[in-house]
């Protein structure tokens, strides 16, 4: 999948490890401060508990990250659930792939 340039993509956040891809240097600096570590082509960080996950989601929303849409508990589905229960109160963006090099970005 071809990722958009100058963006931050949340690839996983519902599991035990948060996975983020970015080519934005300022965002990478924030990820380091949040204890993310660089692994090959992406940033990863263990999620301690649900409060930790919610804090990460909040920070990534503030960074205007794109939350990947997909099946099951995709990052976008998790953020939407948090909005439904009132713990995320601001808008966010999602990305869905329609093909290997075709994606759609939506504002929610």
Protein language model features and the residues they cover:
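Accessory DNA-engaging acidic/polar modules
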Residues: 1-108
